[in-house]
Amino acid sequence: MMMPGPYRLVNWPKCHHGATALNKDEETAMTPIVKKIHHVAYRCKDALETARWYEKHLGMKLVLSIAEDAVPSTGEPDPYMHIFMDAGMGNVLAFFELPTRAPMGRDENTPAWTQHLALEVDSMETLLAAKTRLASAGIQVVGPTDHALFQSIYFFDPNGHRLELACNTNRPGMLEALDKVKWDMLEEWAQTKKAPKHAAWMHDGSYKEMFQ
């Protein structure tokens, strides 16, 4: 069975051979072997509830369900239900329900905003309509937040996974400007652990004047 793959939020710059460079001095990385993300899987509390929630609130259809009493890769006894949701454009979001395991939690040392899944929508109109619809269903929504390249809203699914809906709003020249400073920013961060200011325009609003 062929499963769908990635959803590219922005057409990020590439190096000469299509792979992201290993560093600023090495613009010819190894030939990429990965074609795309096959699927992303998370744990869920209740597979049926999760499938219905994603279909109701995000319009994501259930692609298939897989259930076993043992883990195919290890043979370990561990009954599970594995569901696959259609995330659009050939992308799949999957979940495991593990009824014999301790209740799921999260990494308490990592802030709740950090680990999240971003899903693209086609317009600001769609983004704002989604916020209204989610809020009317009693789901707390943050945003829209302006990231210059895109605007986003944030909320949590029934399992505590943070979700982002993003609408591309990047202007000509933005990606090229970011591409020029990416390694300088990373190397400065590695030394100082303080946010470099090369791309402060993304969140201070000055991009509106810089990129017409």
Task: List PLM regions with ranges.
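Core segments of cupin and vicinal oxygen chelate
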Residues: 43-92
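Histidine- and/or cysteine-centered catalytic micro-motif in compact active-site loops
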Residues: 98-100, 122
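Vicinal oxygen chelate
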Residues: 2-3, 7, 16, 23-32, 37-45, 84-88, 105-133, 151-156, ...
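A short, acidic/glycine-rich surface segment
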Residues: 69-73, 100-106
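Short glycine-/small-residue motifs
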Residues: 92-95, 165
